[in-house]
UniProtKB/Swiss-Prot annotation:
<comment type="similarity">
    <text>Belongs to the peptidase U62 family.</text>
</comment>
<dbReference type="InterPro" id="IPR036059">
    <property type="entry name" value="TldD/PmbA_sf"/>
</dbReference>
<dbReference type="InterPro" id="IPR025502">
    <property type="entry name" value="TldD"/>
</dbReference>
<protein>
    <recommendedName>
        <fullName>Metalloprotease TldD homolog</fullName>
        <ecNumber>3.4.-.-</ecNumber>
    </recommendedName>
</protein>
<dbReference type="GO" id="GO:0005829">
    <property type="term" value="C:cytosol"/>
</dbReference>
<dbReference type="Pfam" id="PF01523">
    <property type="entry name" value="PmbA_TldD_1st"/>
</dbReference>
<comment type="function">
    <text>Probable metalloprotease.</text>
</comment>
<dbReference type="InterPro" id="IPR051463">
    <property type="entry name" value="Peptidase_U62_metallo"/>
</dbReference>
<keyword id="KW-0482">Metalloprotease</keyword>
<dbReference type="GO" id="GO:0008237">
    <property type="term" value="F:metallopeptidase activity"/>
</dbReference>
<dbReference type="GO" id="GO:0006508">
    <property type="term" value="P:proteolysis"/>
</dbReference>
<dbReference type="Pfam" id="PF19289">
    <property type="entry name" value="PmbA_TldD_3rd"/>
</dbReference>
<dbReference type="InterPro" id="IPR045569">
    <property type="entry name" value="Metalloprtase-TldD/E_C"/>
</dbReference>
<keyword id="KW-0645">Protease</keyword>
<dbReference type="InterPro" id="IPR045570">
    <property type="entry name" value="Metalloprtase-TldD/E_cen_dom"/>
</dbReference>
<dbReference type="InterPro" id="IPR002510">
    <property type="entry name" value="Metalloprtase-TldD/E_N"/>
</dbReference>
<dbReference type="Pfam" id="PF19290">
    <property type="entry name" value="PmbA_TldD_2nd"/>
</dbReference>
Length: 483
């Protein structure tokens, strides 16, 4: 079904047919290239913003174009056009191949549509609610936040959605299409008490439509947008009563879900194929070597139903896949796109991703998580005599080459004698990805994915990702605090 819809939208409406595309691909092969591809894309985005009970902004944006890539060895020729027409395709193709020498024209395989599984429905979320229904959701958020506690002095909320169509054709004879919906909600609350102000944030999203936000979640016991609004208030109030964090080296318990961002940054990026091909990752040449505790199995899975990082196909037309990266502490594979896979004599793992038609694809994560273990969270906490329990993070940075990272928490607690003692603030976690993976001594049975707000940046390209993990215990980690 997506083939007909996407072909009609991206090709037929722009007076292009399959034979036109095939002809351009054939002309492409008059130069000395290993392979090449055309990436057609259309993306419609909208967002609505509320500040203190007033709709401050409503934005609607349409972007479409085609990116053309020619690859020979390690060299890539790339050109793109911000319009879709047969002339734009031909000109972009000519520019992309022009850096290579000419050769005798060869025939390419007929374009065949790839069979694929669907991990989200081909729907347009922008059409599921009217404009007034979308803004009323935001007004409701403001009302709920202020009703929850009279110390709330400011409420900011954002609702956004996008509808994306892509079509990929290659000199290998592949033809692949996808329709990608995505919705997201975020809320930030400011509370004040006796002159002290603190913030709390929450939200979520999914590859579905806006009704996702007003549907009850069994884990929450209420609809998602109500829960996330109250959660933002809870975190803000918690920060009002928090104490300064201690500093030193302690056992650290990371909660389930979003704390997996530490693994994403400190470990996940280091397992991307391009860094390892260039020898700039701490995991270079470590396949089949022990890189983590035997309790650790880490997956990158683009096939999870409706998850933010899921892909029916990646941005090179390769079907979404589930890849075991680390199994029982042993490094099994890197995440690969087509280019790096060819240069490393392996296959693409379905991780070729790009921000848009105007960017080149590269190896990127999809939904990355650690599988659950056997320990109960209560037992993990009980095992800590004095340490930190970190439930949420606000930001961080990592050096891919050294694996060194620094992360800041947005919700954390001091643990004493196996009991959660008090909330703490200004907490930073400092360490090395490789060392941290060896420090994992307990893995919980409570795997949870993040709520659907993950955004990953690399080389100036931002893409949606999923992050998850069960609760885990790190035997020791450097904690930066103020006490």
């Amino acid at each position: 079904m997506t083939l007909e819809l996407v072909t009609e939208s991206l090709l037929t409406k722009n007076q292009i047919n399959h034979q036109d595309v095939f002809s351009c691909l054939e002309d492409f092969c008059t130069h000395n290239i290993d392979y090449g591809d055309f990436y057609f894309q259309s993306r419609i985005c909208e967002s609505w913003s509320l500040e203190n009970g007033i709709i401050k902004e409503g934005d609607y944006h349409l972007d479409q174009g085609v990116g053309v890539r020619a690859v020979s060895g390690e060299t890539t020729g790339f050109s793109y056009a911000d319009q879709i027409s047969i002339d734009a395709v031909r000109k972009s193709a000519h520019m992309a191949k022009s850096i290579f020498d000419k050769k005798e024209k060869i025939k390419i395989k007929p374009l065949l549509n790839q069979e694929k599984k669907f991990f989200y429905d081909p729907i347009n979320p922008l059409k599921t609610f009217t404009s007034s229904e979308k803004t009323n959701l935001l007004y409701k958020v403001d009302h709920i936040a202020r009703k929850t506690d009279n110390r709330v002095v400011q409420v900011n909320a954002n609702l956004s959605g996008s509808y994306e169509e892509i079509l990929v054709v290659s000199t290998e004879g592949n033809l692949a299409t996808d329709i990608r919906p995505l919705v997201e909600f975020s809320v930030s609350v400011l509370v004040e008490e006796r002159g002290r102000r603190e913030k709390g944030r929450s939200g979520g999203g999914s590859r579905t439509n806006y009704s996702f936000f007003i549907t009850q979640d069994d884990c929450f016991g209420e609809n998602r947008i109500d829960y996330w609004t109250k959660e933002a208030v809870r975190i803000a109030l918690l920060n009002l009563s928090s104490h300064e964090a201690p500093s030193g080296t302690f056992p650290v318990v990371l909660g389930s879900g979003w704390p997996g961002v530490l693994l994403h940054e400190a470990v996940g990026h280091g397992l991307e194929g391009d860094f390892n091909r260039r020898g700039t990752s701490i995991f270079t040449n470590m396949i089949e070597k022990k890189v983590a505790s035997e309790l650790c199995t880490i997956i990158d899975d683009g096939t999870m139903k409706n998850q933010r990082g899921s892909l029916n196909i990646d941005d090179e037309g390769v079907p979404g896949q589930c890849n075991v990266l680390i199994e029982n502490g042993i490094l099994k594979k890197y995440m690969q796109d087509k280019l790096n896979a060819r240069l490393m004599n392996t296959k693409s793992t379905g991780n070729g991703r790009r921000e848009s038609y105007s960017h080149l694809p590269m190896p990127r994560m999809t939904n990355t998580y650690m599988i659950p273990g056997k320990s109960k969270l209560e037992d993990i906490i009980n095992s800590v005599d004095y340490g930190i329990y970190a439930i949420n993070f606000s930001g961080g940075q990592v050096d891919i080459t050294s694996g060194q990272f620094v992360f800041s928490t947005s919700e954390a607690y001091l643990v004493k004698k196996g009991k959660i003692f008090s909330p703490i603030r200004n907490t930073t976690l400092i360490g090395s990805g490789l060392e941290v993976m060896q420090q994992i001594s307990m893995v919980g049975n409570d795997l949870k994915m993040d709520q659907g707000m993950g955004m990953c940046g690399k080389d100036g390209q931002n893409i949606p990702v999923g992050i998850g993990q069960p609760s885990i215990k790190l035997e020791k980690l450097t904690v930066g605090g103020t006490v």
